Amino acid sequence: MAFTHLHVHTEYSLLDGSSKIKELLPRAKELGMDSLAITDHGVMYGVIDFYKKAKEVGIKPILGCEIYVAPGSRFDREQGRGEDRYYHLVLLAENNQGYNCLLYTSDAAD
């Protein structure tokens, strides 16, 4: 049975991702994976490199992003009562329109 990781951080997820795209995709192929997602934290910087390298090694690239969902503005500095004030949400593009929506969402968050 094929297995695909749908929540993967690369070196573009600062302070969280340690996988380098140039090493990640050949290793995934070696492990028998036929597809793999990229879901870096709040950025889409690595998707072009990821896409090209995935195609090069014969893996279907799944482009995505892990975004933060938070009430209010990112400039709010109100402290919660010990609980997190934001949530993580993984978004994956199904097609070119979805990819464009990811780019728009990522850009709008800045």
Please state what every model-predicted region is:
Residues 1-106:
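Phosphodiester-processing cores and adjacent nucleic acid-binding clamps
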